[in-house]
Amino acid sequence: IILYMIDFNQFPSPCYIMEEELLRKNLCLIKNVADRAGVEIILAFKSFAMWRSFPIFREYIDHSTASSVYEARLALEEFGSKAHTYSPAYTEQDFPEIMRCSSHITFNSMQQFERFLSDGGGRRK
């Protein structure tokens, strides 16, 4: 166990403090597991969206998830890759931007798929 003596009074409050060395150690472990298992790890913005750390994450993880148009845009513009997007509900207004910012889109139902992507015969609009 590594213990650090940090004077937390030196930081403004509230703020987030990230220890880069430990983050990299954990990301290295995650990447090693993914490589050995032959899988891709996807960063979920719901649990972690500290966008200033995205350059570090990009060294270890290639993709992210999004559950809104804003997260999809964050994935493309700040993380640097299109998102794997899932949302229980999409709007006609947001869907073109979701498509622009996403590499994968998961629908909640066949009705939702047909509403946004199908011409009614299962073919893409």
Please name every model-derived segment.
Residues 3-18:
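Generic N-terminal amphipathic, Lys/Arg-enriched alpha-helix
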